[in-house]
């Protein structure tokens, strides 16, 4: 075998291994979402923050929050639930997803930003502090900058 054949064969083998790993991870994630305890989801009620609060609604099921983050839209889990019952057997969620969520910073409130046009800006207008522009000085500055030329050298 030549070196090129070995490199190509190794690349194909590495690609197949990576695709197998991705397929196994996707299957495990599908099983995890499908095979959760049904009682925990049906018994827990989500608080209705949309009506009573200015904060977005949060899921009460912390496994969904840890895996996907908080979502303000309805979950597609209920539609796929019938299909998952035939595929899955009961198993526990991975241990790395069971850590408690981090604290909410800034008290959990949103920070409002204003643009410059929204803020009331008062400029200090003291005409007495402004200096009168001297025309001689202005022409001297123009000449000083117009005389400067770039010098190029061979490298």
Swiss-Prot record:
Keyword tRNA processing: no
Membrane topology note: Single-pass membrane protein
GO cellular component terms, semicolon-separated: membrane
Subcellular localization: Membrane
Major localisation: membrane
Keyword Nucleotide-binding in record: no
UniProt cross-references to InterPro entries, sorted A to Z: FAM163, FAM163B
Record field: transmembrane: 6-26
Keywords noted in UniProt: Membrane, Transmembrane, Transmembrane helix
Homology family: Belongs to the FAM163 family.
Database matches in PANTHER family: PROTEIN FAM163B, PROTEIN FAM163B MEMBER
Entry protein name: Protein FAM163B
Source species of the chain: Xenopus tropicalis (Western clawed frog)
């Amino acid at each position: 075998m030549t070196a090129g054949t070995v490199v190509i064969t190794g690349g194909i083998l590495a690609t197949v291994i990576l695709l197998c790993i991705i397929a196994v991870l996707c299957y495990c994630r599908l099983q995890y979402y499908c095979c959760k305890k049904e009682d925990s989801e049906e018994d827990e009620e989500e608080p209705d923050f949309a009506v009573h609060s200015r904060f977005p609604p949060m899921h009460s099921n912390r496994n969904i929050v840890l895996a996907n983050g908080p979502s303000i839209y309805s979950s597609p889990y209920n539609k796929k639930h019938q299909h998952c019952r035939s595929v899955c057997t009961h198993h526990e969620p991975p241990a790395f997803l069971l850590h408690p969520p981090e604290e909410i910073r800034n008290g959990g409130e949103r920070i409002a930003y204003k643009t410059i046009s929204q803020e009331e800006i008062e400029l200090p207008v003291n005409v007495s502090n402004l200096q009168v522009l001297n025309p001689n000085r202005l022409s001297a500055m123009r000449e000083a900058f117009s005389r400067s030329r770039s010098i190029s050298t061979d490298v």
